[in-house]
Amino acid sequence: MVFQSFILGNLVSLCMKIINSVVVVGLYYGFLTTFSIGPSYLFLLRARVMDEGEEGTEKKVSATTGFIAGQLMMFISIYYAPLHLALGRPHTITVLALPYLLFHFFWNNNKHFFDYGSTTRNEMRNLRIQCVFLNNLIFQLFNHFILPSSMLARLVNIYMFRCNNKMLFVTSSFVGWLIGHILFMKWVGLVLVWIQQNNSIRSNVLIRSNKYKFLVSELRNSMARIFSILLFITCVYYLGRIPSPIFTKKLKGTSETGGTKQDPEVSTEEAPFRSLFSEEREDLDKIDEMEEIRVNGKEKINKDDEFHVRTYYNYKTVSENRDGNKENSNLKFLKIKEDPFFFLWFEKPFVTLVFDYKRWNRPNRYIKNDKIENTVRNEMSQYFFYTCQSDGKERISFTYPPNLSTFFEMIQKKISSFTRAKAPSDQVYAYWSLLNEKKKENLKNEFLNRIEALDLDKERSFENILEKTTRFCHNETKKEYLPKLYDPFLHGISRGKIKKLLPFKKITDINIGIGGSWINKIHGILLRINSHKFEQTIEKFTRKSLSIEKKLSFFSEPQEEKINSEEEIKIFKFLFDVVITDNNNKTLIKNFIDFHEINKNVPRWSYKLTSELEELEGENEENVPTEPGIRSRKAKSVVVFTDKEPHNGIFTNLKDNQNSDQKDEMALIRYSQHSDFRRDLIKGSMRSQRRKTVIWDFFQAKVHSPLFFDRIDKLFFFSFDFWGLKKKIIRNFMWKKKKKEFLKKEDEQSKRKETRRIEIAETWDSFPFSQIIRGSLLVTQSILRKYIILPLLIIIKNSTRALLFQVPEWSEDLKDWKREMHVKCTYNGVQLSETEFPRNWLTDGIQIKILFPFYLKPWHKLKVQSSQKARLKKIKDKGEKTDFGFLTVWGMETELPFGSAKKKRSFFEPIFKELKKRIKKFKTKPFRVLSIFKERATIFLKVTKERKNWIIKNLLFRKGKRKNISKQNIIPLFGVREIDELNETKKDSIMSNQMIYELSGQKKSMEWPNSSLNENKIKNLIDRIKIIKNQTEEISKEKENLTNRCNKPRYDSQIIASSKKRWQAFKRKNIRLIRKSFFFFKFCIEQLSITFFLGIINIPRITTQLQLFFESTKTILDKYIYKNEENGEKKKNQKNTIYFISTLKNLISKNKKFSYDLCSLSQAYVFYKLSQIQVSNFSKLKAVLEYNICITSFFVKNQIKDFCQEQGIFHYELKDKTFFNSEVNPWKYWLRSHSQYNLPWIAWARLVTQKWKKKINQDFLVLNTSLIKTDLYEKNKIDNYKKQQFFEANSLLNSKHNLKKDYIYNSFCYRSIHSREKKFDMSMSIGITPDNCLVSSFLEKYNIQVIGEIGHRKYLDWRILNFWFRKKVNIGLLIDTKSKKKYIKTKVQNYKKIDKITKTDLANQKSFFFDWMGMNEERLNHRITNFAFFFFSEFFLFSSTYKTKPWVIPIKLLLFNFNEKKNVNKKITLKKKGFIPSNEKGPLRFFNLNKEENELVGQGELESDNEKKRNPESALSNQEKNIEKNYAESKIKKRQNKKQYKSHTEAELYLFLTRYSRFQLRWNCFFNQKILNNIKVYCLLVRLKNPNEIAISSIERGELSLDILMIEKNFTFSKLMKKGILIIEPVRLSVKNDGQLIIYRTVGISLVHKNKQKISKRYKKKSYIDKKNNYDFFIPENILSPKRRREFRILICFNLKKKNARDRNSRFDKNIQNLTTVLHKKKDLYKDKKTLIKLKSFLWPNFRLEDLACMNRYWFNTTNGNHFSMIRIHMYARFQIR
């Protein structure tokens, strides 16, 4: 067994060695390359097939040798780098192919010119054979077209780095290709032989017919020529994508000899957002790196492998400005000194210079966005292979920085003494592990020492024991440090905060803007400046329009100039360095202090290109070149809006004054619905072939590779609309031929109209001055119609009505006439406004649209308020009738421009209709009288006939009765007996005989002697019984007949019945009136008194007396009613209990329209009554009002009170007995203030009646403010639905509090990974007792106003989100001035205004009146609505829950900014906050309303210094502000090349498009016109001041559909995507992600914990701490700094000693372990793997986030984060969000 296993093991290992050997892999790759067929195969096959004879064999040999030689060159190019560069570049094909193709073309066309005749001595002199060899050699180097070999080439390149013996790999791959090629050619030969031998195939050829013999012979003779033409076409197809290297125009680069003006451009070309780690900004992917480190005015540049040392000397001369010479005022010299010691020249190969297709004259693509102006040069791939040390071992890294490797190679070449001794791998690893062990031990010792110091030195503070962060110091004596923003030793938040700046804003620091008011007062008087540049800067600083309003406005004002260049900042510094010597205006100018900046430049292309789209938009008019360099998608600019009003900016320039008369236009780009083949490529650049994409639609949104077809949801390769096909089949089956014909006619008619309309439009365009004539005619027609024709018609109509003794309708007609609007439109139909004409309307054309056209009516109908159903029906009927039209040249109206005229409404048509109706009525009146008379006569005759017949029948019946009585025998005992007429059935006779026999038998037995007598008696009795039965039956039958006759329905009987019913109904109504007469009379008296006293109410003397009289009479009446009701209720209670509320609810459910109106109630009366009643809890009123159980009187009955008490709505017994304090507030706000029951309907549904009643009563016992019990708190089940009350402290508490907070965050970090149990509450049990601490300290720590409004606070860090205000609202600093008592030291707290978000707002969110893009300008203070929830309704629930409980979802995982809508009341804000109005000038000041408040502000200012000492964070926050200020200044410098916006509206449009149009939404054809109509209406509504009327009318007409406005709540985007209505096209932007963004998107979980909850006297929140998980446990590692802490954890977790030190490529070594030993250790490997997975899952969320985020830039060296995210997904498990 052991022997067998040994043999098997050897065989397996042998097989593995053979498979992994270099020779086998090379053979495999070589065999695969045979399938990549190129154009050289055509030559080879032609030589093998077409050529025959001795020359043919020679051609075959030369073809095969050339083919093999070409392929050998390709394989050698894999090993030899210069040859690979030469053959791999596209310009190689350009240089080699074009001349050779021309030669080949002339060779085949003019054979006699090159033919020297064949010589048998030396066939190599024959040029034909040489050309065959060259054809196969050269064309083998060209691109392949049947199976492209790019994938194979990549595999070969990867394996070349893995294997050691590279030459063996190349030779083996060539041998493999040779084998495959021989097999392929043999297969081709066999196929040809089979075709020759098969007669059936040869017989089908056209040669057998005599007609085509000549053609076929010609075809064979000219085969070479046809072949050369085809080859030329294929090669031109390839060469068409390649730019010509000689004749293309080179782009103009930016000149580098611009002195100091060009210097800032070179030095600051990097992304504007600096990250926390400045080294992350460095792009290590480039060879030509340019490093620039300015220290003390010196600069080092590494550019194009040349080292220069440039020294800039900046001199400022001591000048005298007596003569006013401008040239000597600002002198600057630039001196370039070249040092020969630092000058090094590195050669460049000729191949890279000639054949670098990207460096030849232009790049492939030009990627430009807001962050990067010039495109980055990308000379190499983002993957670069090189050896590096990782974990103590030397490994091949595929993302090694290429600049380091090239630098190392250059140094090795130039410095001969530089040698690198390679140490063995085991020794390197041992050294590395030893080093890490030492580090771990040092950290352990330091950690233990610090812990011991905690126990020993208890008097020391925690701050001294904690590890301090190290700072980078460049001057130890003065202790000067680097700024925190640039300090490499600082990590995380201490590196400074980044202001999120908008891309179009030109930001100036607020300190500079405010300080500008006093700069010129001092220096402007003392200093005389003659330079033009100084004048501009002074003009900028003299502007005093800067205020907080404009600083925090939604759109920044246009700023033509900005303080961003280095020179201007130096001039600004110059103002502070001026020293005045004497009156002769001599100035001594100090030398400038150089600006030290550590930065790094990325190599970029030296030119800037503009696209065709930018030229169309007209941007950057100053710097735009003559021709755009980038080919953009075909588009047209459509002018939407022109603004004549000037916008006053912060900074102005001379250009604004010059162009003040010009109009400010807003244009949108309209794209054509065609595929974009241009793809923003640079003109003349390489057109790369897109092999991976497959396009099957005419216009496909998302082009992708066939590899991803499995991810498509469709079943088939092409989309198959099954439901659409089914509908079509059903429709075709159901419809008849007539309908089809009718539809065809309609379609033809509409097509005719459309063609006619197009023809008319084309005719107007064809003539030269037609648009001028048409435009002038349209304007005259509109003026004539509006101001002459229609007023004349109104005058004629009303004068004729007055003559005909009818009331004239002047007001109605004039109202309709004023409503008509003539809107000017562009030639395409885009609406502008009534007064605004489109640009160049005389040349481009104009359309005039008539909105609400006036039609003259003979009379106006009275508008009765119709129901909603009637209104909807009316809208449906009017759906086809359009309430607008376009004006024609002849004064007619059309539905579409250049369409057919509409039929006018006739003025006389309704008159004729009315006349016809009246004539008909007049005719029908006499005929109605005759018809009624005839009906009455027929009824009378019918009644008389019926009566006559009834009398006759009664008489006949009586006669028949008399005859029957005479025939009968009278028996005295039994009455009348009939003998003759007996009708007995057989059955009755048989039964009677049986009974008689039985009776007779019994009698015989009992009474034997008298049996005969008894029998006779019995017989007689039986006979009499039978007769009686028969008689009763007959009588009953006759009665039935009589009743049937009498009950027949007659006309008079119906009348009688209906009259009875009417009488009964009248009786009931009278009873009801009698019953309710008292209330009716009372209501009448009230109405009469109100109407009587309304006229006299304005007289002041009478009003008071009247009011008292009215109130006294009303109280008397109410008391009387109340007594009567009480007596009635007592009687009812004695009999039975009637549930009043249930009956009332039943009444309401029966009649749903039943409602009451409380608007008629007087507010004064309500407050008067409330002051009389001693009740405080009126929250029941709200509940009653919400359920429409509205009662006119506010005296609620006892039945309602009992019912509410049973249901738990309120507790009547626990009402407050104190007097009610009625504040004079608005009525609606007073009612809304009682919001205890404003819970969502889900909460109401879950609550059980009785339990909820008990709990809510207990809760209100605590919440009642007047009760004495303060510390009572009981936990109930509706805590989740109650409004949580939280606050945020504005300043840091003491150090212990900070430590506790830090422990909570750290413990959360630990427990969120490991704990998979129930959710925990991280609240801390910190109670604030009012006895121990003063009120002043409490007020100083916490914000009073926040505590007051604590139910509405949103405990969320709003600094993360951006607020976008539409109008410039005065948002000042909110000042807390609520507490006005003198003995309390209140501190003025400045904090940001935060939206009030409650559960009621989230549950009952109602969108305000139709507002889109700010068209409802009457409401200035609301926010922009975010339509993300209407598209993605599934996120709405999560967002609403997050706003009330933000600890559920981390804030960084929310994908949107939810902008809440809010209307700010100006009166309230004036009372509570101080702000600076826009027209106020001067320094920043706060104003208060009361003197006490001013005193408090003064106290707050005095306490600021003391607060800095007490509060450690105040100084830190100031430092952060300084960092932000410096950061803003640096950003100001770096934004000088940014896009200058011409106008305010252009910036607004840009912001709107970037914020809301990040995705291009495309729609289907049937959805297209509807949306376009909506957009046209929007464009009109944007320009109107009060667009409410037009918006409503357009909604009614159907022009503006609400479903497109996304007002529906369940309007989901996924449904539209599935239906195919909307298709999203993402705008792909090349954005360079910031390091801070990467870290804080992964690390920063900004949770607001429950420890920020309100803790007051009445609320002591209990801390719910799980027993198993001690979340507030002390973490000793916090003693160390975060950096050392992370390092310590990683070193502990990595088991360095047990790690195997073998290399990855060890399987190629000879000293490989035996397979059996590996198999035995499988279990241990599995355990290690499990521990490694645990280790990774432990390290990922805690310690390695920053390292992995940096790894995206360093280790993986990618500009996009896709590779990084994929690695993260595969390596690390997902974690639940807690």
Swiss-Prot record:
GO cellular component: chloroplast inner membrane
UniProt-listed GO biological process terms: protein transport
Domain of life: Eukaryota
Main location, first listed in the record: plastid
Region of interest (Disordered), residue spans: 1498-1520
Keywords noted in UniProt: Chloroplast, Membrane, Plastid, Plastid inner membrane, Protein transport, Transmembrane, Transmembrane helix, Transport
Localization: Plastid, Chloroplast inner membrane
Pfam family, one: Ycf1
Protein's recorded name: Protein TIC 214
Gene assigned in the entry: TIC214
